[in-house]
Regions:
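Conserved SAM-binding loop of SAM-dependent methyltransferases across substrates and taxa
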Residues: 24-35
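A short helix->loop->beta-strand "cap" motif at the edges of active sites that frequently abuts
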Residues: 36-37, 117
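Conserved class I S-adenosyl-L-methionine
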Residues: 14-23
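Conserved alpha-helix/loop element of class I SAM-dependent methyltransferases that forms part
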Residues: 1-15, 30
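A short beta-strand submotif of the Rossmann-like class I SAM-dependent methyltransferase core
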Residues: 92-95
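A short acidic, Gly/Pro-enriched loop at the edge of an enzyme's catalytic core
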Residues: 78-89
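S-adenosyl-L-methionine-dependent methyltransferase catalytic module, highlighting the catalytic core
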Residues: 1, 5, 26, 48-66, ...
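Conserved SAM-binding motif I beta-strand of class I
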Residues: 38-43
Length: 180
C-alpha cells in the first residue's frame, strides 16, 4: 500500500528521491512514476532489494515510469552512504520503530535531505501497536522487529529537534495485521 501522497509533495522533474527502508519498493516505484525523477531505494535486506529491483525493472518493461532513473543501495539508516544535502525528498516509511538508535537515524536522514525540502515519515499508530505488543511477546521480541512505540507528539518533537518543521499529518491506516 502506497501511503505517500506524491501529489501533495510537489515533486518536480529533476528531483532526487530517497526511499529509506524501501522493502519491496512500493514508494520507490511510486516515485519512479513521477516525471523525470531519480528514485533511490535503500534497505539493509538484500532479499527486499532484489524484489524492489524486479519491480522497478517491470516498470521499465511496461514503460510505467516518468522517464527518470532508479537505483538501489544496501544502506543502514544510521550511516547513510550519501553526501550531505543530496535529496529533494526523503521517505522513511515504517522504519524508525525498528531502529534502536532512532535519533541517530533522524540525524542521518536530515543530513542527506536538502534544506527546506520535504521529509515524509510514517510509523505505526500508537494504540494498534500497543495492542499488538500486548497480544504477544514475540511481536516486539523478533530480531529486526519493532523496538519502540511512538506517540505522535514524541515523534514530532524528535524530528523538530533536528530542524524538521511539521506541515501536515496524514493517517493512511489505523489498523494493521500483527506479524510474528
Amino acid at each position: 500500500m502506497v501511503t505517500v501522497k506524491f501529489d501533495r509533495l510537489a515533486v518536480k522533474p529533476g528531483f532526487k528521491v530517497l526511499d529509506i527502508g524501501c522493502g519491496s519498493g512500493r514508494h520507490t516505484c511510486a516515485a519512479y512514476q513521477c516525471r523525470n525523477v531519480t528514485a533511490i531505494g535503500a534497505d539493509l535486506n538484500f532479499k527486499d532489494l532484489t524484489e524492489a529491483g524486479e519491480r522497478l525493472k517491470l516498470h521499465d518493461r511496461l514503460c510505467a515510469h516518468g522517464g527518470g532513473v532508479w537505483g538501489l543501495s544496501a544502506a543502514d539508516v544510521t550511516c547513510l552512504p550519501f553526501k550531505d544535502d543530496d535529496f529533494d525528498l526523503v521517505i522513511c516509511s515504517e522504519v524508525l520503530e525498528h531502529i534502536v538508535e532512532h535519533q541517530v537515524a533522524i540525524e542521518e536522514i536530515v543530513r542527506v535531505l536538502k534544506p527546506g525540502c520535504n521529509l515524509v515519515v510514517s510509523v505505526p499508530r500508537y494504540w494498534p501497536e500497543r495492542i499488538c505488543w500486548a497480544l504477544s511477546q514475540d511481536y516486539h521480541n523478533t530480531p529486526g522487529g519493532h523496538v519502540r512505540i511512538f506517540k505522535k507528539s514524541d515523534l514530532i518533537a524528535d524530528l523538530e529537534n533536528y530542524g524538521v518543521e511539521k506541515w501536515a499529518v496524514h493517517f493512511a491506516h489505523s489498523l494493521h495485521t500483527p506479524f510474528w
